[in-house]
């Protein structure tokens, strides 16, 4: 099994480590300073307070003739189309897009070819410290496993094989029917959370700001109530908790989560490092919400 990780940030590096540990033939494609570090030191990561080096091949360029069983595209939303263009002529058949985006999957297929895209989203978080060492982890299964689906919503040989490699790598996963709806609901949650950090005077201690926590709770209730009304369902179903929890309880839960080690690793670190991406996703998400609202009024 040959796997290419396109993108050597936190998410790409962690999946490369996990696949390499499993024994898969794993390569990771990097650029710039990250490439320089990896070429010199290898893919270093922290595990049980020890520093280890993953048995992964470091690539600074790609050949169209290099065929992989799976390519995992782990880049930011604003890097997506450049990456797809570079992979357009690659011989590999399956590109797993682990990207925050509300774009139509057809636009992606128009670039790389129909049937090659497997939309997905990672269940992981963490950071790469100033020494270039990965300190990351998978999110607990009950919170957010690696999620994916065929564009059609049907099961396929692609989803079967991807499930198999995730299972062998001990990576929690779930298959859904409508990946676009899942990503829309995901953004309904993470956009207000990121906004809270950006609005706080001290982002690292945003959970201490009761006013911001209450505002964030209101945004979450509003987002999910609107989506439920528009789509008739939420994905996954557990997102309905944001609709039903009383505002005071949700505010307290948010404050506790923001101040926890979980909040630091899986929420704060990403919001801090990907502020440009999250601000752009904020614009896209609320523009999409406005579009849905206007379409509903036209029907009425």
Regions found by a protein language model. Give the residues of each.
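Flavin-binding catalytic cores
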Residues: 164, 212-237
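NAD(P)-dependent Rossmann-like dehydrogenase/reductase catalytic/cofactor-binding core
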Residues: 228-300
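Rossmann-fold dinucleotide-binding core
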Residues: 106-182
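NAD(P)+-binding Rossmann beta1-loop-alpha1 motif at the extreme N-terminus of oxidoreductases
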Residues: 1-53
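Hydrophobic anchor at the start of a short beta-strand
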Residues: 3, 25-26, 95, 117, ...
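Rossmann-like NAD(P)(H) cofactor-binding subdomain of soluble oxidoreductases
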Residues: 50-135
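Helix-loop-beta segment of a Rossmann-like dinucleotide-binding subdomain
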Residues: 135-149, 198-208, 261-272
């Amino acid at each position: 099994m040959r796997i290419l990780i396109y993108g050597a940030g936190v998410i790409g590096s962690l999946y490369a480590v996990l696949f390499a540990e499993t024994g898969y033939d794993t390569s990771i494609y990097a650029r710039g300073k990250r490439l320089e570090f990896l070429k010199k030191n290898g893919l270093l990561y922290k595990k049980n307070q020890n520093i280890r080096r993953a048995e992964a091949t470091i690539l600074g360029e790609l050949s169209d003739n290099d065929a992989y069983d799976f390519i995992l595209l782990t880049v930011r939303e604003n890097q997506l189309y450049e990456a797809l263009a570079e992979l357009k002529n690659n011989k590999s058949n399956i590109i797993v897009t682990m990207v925050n985006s509300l774009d139509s999957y057809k636009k992606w297929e128009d670039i790389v070819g129909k049937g090659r895209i497997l939309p997905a989203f990672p269940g992981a978080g963490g950071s790469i410290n100033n020494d270039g060492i990965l300190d990351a982890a998978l999110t607990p299964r009950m919170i957010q496993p690696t999620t994916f689906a065929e564009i059609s919503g049907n099961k396929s040989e692609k989803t079967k094989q991807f499930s198999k490699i995730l299972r062998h790598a001990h990576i929690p996963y779930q298959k859904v029917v409508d990946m676009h709806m899942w990503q829309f609901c995901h953004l309904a949650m993470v956009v207000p959370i990121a906004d809270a950090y950006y609005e706080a005077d001290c982002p690292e201690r945003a959970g201490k700001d009761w006013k911001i926590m209450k505002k964030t709770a209101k945004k979450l209730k509003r987002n999910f109530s609107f989506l439920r009304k528009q789509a008739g369902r939420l994905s996954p179903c557990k997102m309905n908790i944001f609709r039903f929890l009383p505002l005071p309880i949700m505010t307290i839960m948010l404050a506790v989560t923001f101040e926890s080690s979980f909040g630091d690793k899986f929420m704060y670190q990403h919001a801090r490092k990907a502020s440009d991406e999250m601000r752009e996703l904020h614009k896209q998400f609320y523009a999409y919400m406005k579009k849905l609202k206007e379409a509903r009024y036209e029907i009425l």
